[in-house]
Regions:
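Conserved alpha-helical scaffold segments that buttress catalytic/binding sites
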Residues: 2-65, 70-347
Length: 347
């Protein structure tokens, strides 16, 4: 089975009361129960069932997970990111909610997980793409958030976006902003966690389009000259981790605003190895330099506040390497920042 509903036990935490003034994520999330579909590919229908099914037409944020680290294994990384979705839910669960999220005016719907079984990454990505497209196409969805998983998640996010009513199907200009220490533009015989944006570029070229791709946080020592040359050839816009630090929050805000200004739809992907190792030790490749959390958060809030953010994924959390759940907590804060900004749910 490559898709499954989230168990209710995934959303538990401190309970201070039942009113909106006490609201936390675990009290607000509504778990979508689904019948198993015959097909798990992009065309397989994701069926919702049960007496208390969350209304897909209600104003909401859709959440889903992709339990996969086969792409990391193929990329010779340290596996464990398949456990990322569960750890991210645990980190999100106790966070306080405010405004329309606390009052239930904007809901949180958990659509469940897709999974890579064994070494069949491609089937897992197809299942995740179908679930992602379903999240995007739910009538009331303001934002779809994918909890990874290795950065192979980005390819399934792309397929989901292309299979949804957003982007090219709607005649919309779309682009992807990657917060990452790496370009992930590798050319490999098989897809890995290091190839998703090369795959996107090839797919866009085949469709007669150019990939609009920007990256914040590139670590020069972690990307070869060949990767920089490939990025230049594809017209990628990027800042290194050192440039991000020098530019500060204002500069990063301008970078994101300028990128989003040319788009109708924005897809944001956060590889947690963009953060310094002290903040995010729980990743396959911890960053010696990294982009400080406040600057990364500025990029996230600017993207979320653009009015164009439709899809967010957060990837590369490896709980087995995480110290004191630092990485999971930082990731949860960034997800919460994005959701609060999109929904206008400040305190």
């Amino acid at each position: 089975m490559t898709t499954s509903s989230t168990p209710a036990s995934a959303w538990t935490g401190r309970h201070d009361g039942d009113g909106p003034e006490h609201a936390r994520w675990h009290q607000a999330v509504q778990v979508v129960r689904r019948r198993e579909a015959d097909g798990d590919g992009p065309s397989g229908e994701v069926a919702e069932a049960g007496a208390a099914v969350p209304d897909p037409a209600a104003d909401h944020v859709a959440l889903l997970g992709f339990r996969s680290d086969e792409g990391v294994r193929r990329n010779r990384g340290r596996v464990g990111a398949a456990d990322g979705p569960a750890a991210l839910r645990r980190a999100l669960a106790p966070l306080a909610l405010h405004g329309p999220l606390a009052h239930g005016e904007v809901q949180l719907h958990d659509l469940g997980d897709a999974e890579t079984v064994g070494e069949d990454l491609e089937a897992g990505q197809a299942a995740a793409a179908a679930l992602t497209a379903h999240g995007l196409d739910r009538a009331g969805a303001r934002l779809t958030v994918v909890l990874g998983g290795g950065h192979e998640t980005a390819w399934s996010s792309y397929l989901g976006l292309m299979g949804s009513g957003f982007g090219p199907r709607a005649g919309q200009r779309w682009g992807v902003l990657n917060l990452d220490a790496h370009f992930d533009l590798r050319s490999e015989p098989r897809p890995t966690s290091g190839t998703p944006f090369a795959q996107m570029a090839a797919a866009e070229h085949a469709a007669g389009r150019e990939l609009r791709y920007a990256v914040l946080g590139i670590a020069e020592p972690s990307n070869t000259g060949a990767l920089f040359e490939k990025a230049r050839g594809l017209g990628v816009t990027w800042w290194t981790d050192e440039q991000c630090l020098a530019a500060g929050a204002e500069g990063i805000t301008r970078f994101v605003e300028q990128f989003a200004a040319e788009l109708d739809v924005l897809y944001l992907t956060i590889d947690l190895d963009v953060l310094p190792a002290a903040v995010a030790p729980g990743v396959s490749a911890p960053a010696a330099h990294g982009v400080p959390l406040p600057l990364t958060a500025a990029a996230v809030r600017t993207a979320a506040g653009s009015g164009k953010l439709a899809l967010l994924d957060v990837v590369e959390l490896n709980p087995s390497l995480d110290i004191d759940s630092r990485t999971a907590r930082a990731a949860a804060r960034l997800i919460d920042d994005a959701v609060r900004t999109v929904t206008g749910a400040g305190a």
